[in-house]
């Protein structure tokens, strides 16, 4: 059984770039059958997972395969750049 790849988006409540990025990321990730997308709002309730992944700014996107980080993107990226980055990192994750 093949493990799925995870994309985790960390965002903040008052982060305009996070809200702009969210629909773009959801649209891009939906084209991959073997990728799960999770959204985590950085708050007091999520501090344990924020510390685990050493998130120091939002938005941050992580790509994990078997719980091992294979990609990290900090800050807002235009859709075209994000699509290229996701393709590259997801392809790398599939090879692991």
Whereabouts are the PLM-identified features?
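Non-catalytic, surface beta->alpha helical segment in thiol-disulfide oxidoreductase systems
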Residues: 63-96
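CheY-like receiver
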Residues: 49-52, 85
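Local sequence-structure signature of Cys/Sec-based thiol-disulfide redox active-site neighborhoods
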Residues: 1-31
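Active-site loop signature of alpha/beta-hydrolase-fold enzymes
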Residues: 45, 58, 70
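Thiol-based oxidoreductase modules, predominantly thioredoxin-like and allied folds used
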Residues: 10, 33-47
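Residue-level recognition of oxygen-bearing side chains
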Residues: 20, 45, 78-81
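Structural micro-motif
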Residues: 53-62
């Amino acid at each position: 059984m093949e493990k799925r790849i995870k994309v985790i988006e960390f965002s903040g409540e008052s982060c305009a770039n996070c809200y702009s990025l969210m629909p773009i990321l959801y649209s891009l990730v939906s084209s991959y059958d073997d990728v799960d997308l999770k959204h985590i709002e950085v708050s007091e309730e999520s501090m344990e997972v924020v510390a685990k992944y050493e998130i120091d700014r939002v938005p941050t996107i992580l790509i994990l395969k078997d719980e091992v980080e294979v990609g990290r993107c900090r800050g807002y990226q235009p859709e075209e750049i994000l699509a290229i980055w996701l393709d590259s990192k997801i392809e790398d994750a599939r090879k692991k």
